[in-house]
Amino acid sequence: MKHTGIIRAGLILTGLVLISSTTAPKKEAAPTGPDYQTLVNTAYAKYKDLKEGKNADYIPALAEVPSDLFGIGLVTVDGKAFTAGDIQTMVSIQSISKVLTLARVIEEQGAQAIEDKVGVDATGEVFNSITAIERMKGKEINSCVNPGAIATTSMVKGDSYEAKWKSIIDTHSDFAGRALTVNEPVYKSEAATNQRNQAIAQLLFAYDRMYWDPAKSTDLYTKQCAINVNAHDLAEIAATFANGGINPVTGKVVVSPNSVEHTLAVMATAGLYDDSGIWLYHVGLPGKSGVGGGIIAVCPGKFGIGVVAPPLDAAGNSVKGQKVVRDLVDQLKANLYLVQPVVPAPAKKK
């Protein structure tokens, strides 16, 4: 009987040990991510009183936009938004529209069609250069400068002006996650003063580089540049690129990862006009600016940044916008070319 009691006690003890040994280990605290909101707030406070730059005035309506307008948005690929300043006031999207229409055309016709019919090289000329067209031996322009952008817009699928416009505005709306509209005063102002773009389109047509009616294509391009956006819209647009073409807020598939890949390559090459090289040298992210004061930056797989601040530098890029993006990228160590050693250096022999 005593032996039986010992055996029973041993079984009970063994059971206790088993129970104890299978108890789930304590969970370690999950690592915290970047404090995006604090970083955005800090950047806003740092630059809100900066007075450098000047509104674009070659389009009369842009000169009337308040020069102190300033808003920052950052949207992550999981759909979280962090903002500071004025994120509601609208400005015209201007040249940022170029990369959304580019993404649509790549989606419809493939990346090779853009390379063959427009080009993907930097021109080394100003964004609205006419001489760049005549100096080219082939299709060495790109969709981020006016000649290439107008040609790209002419490639949008549709059997009528209305069908093409629906494709353009729907694409912009899907990227931004809401129905966007045109700023009619800006559109009318640009349409009345876009003789240079009309000339560019006619010259492209003469060189067989326009793929639809040049006058109507120029008007479509002018209209897309007048689409209204705010800082949050721009951040969501950038985040949609960062998320491989799926809007991280709405979940809508806007374009494919392949279209994003090739669009970002063109943005990295020529997204900030004459200062694209300087931008990439310091920021290391694909970006796109517009003379309305907007700017976007895309950190693939992580987040998108959008800034609205109308005063521009000599190259036509938002002064505050560039500084904000550079600060945020530096703080987040998000430069795509920032590489830490993978294999440590060998120990020095004594």
Predicted regions and their residues:
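Short, conserved catalytic-motif segment at the N-terminal edge
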Residues: I59, V65, V75-T89
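Bacterial Sec-dependent signal peptides at the C-terminal "C-region" and cleavage site
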Residues: L16-P31
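Active-site-adjacent helix/loop patches that line small-molecule binding or acyl-intermediate pockets
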Residues: P31-T42, L50-E52, V105-Q224
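Active-site SXXK
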Residues: G79, S92-E115, I237, I305
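Active-site-proximal alpha-helical segments within enzyme catalytic domains
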Residues: V99, I200, N228-I246, C299-P310
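Structured C-terminal helix/loop/strand segments within mature extracytoplasmic catalytic/sensor domains
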Residues: A29, N243-K350
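Beta-lactamase-like hydrolase cores
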Residues: K27-I72
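Bacterial N-terminal signal peptides that target proteins for export
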Residues: M1-L11
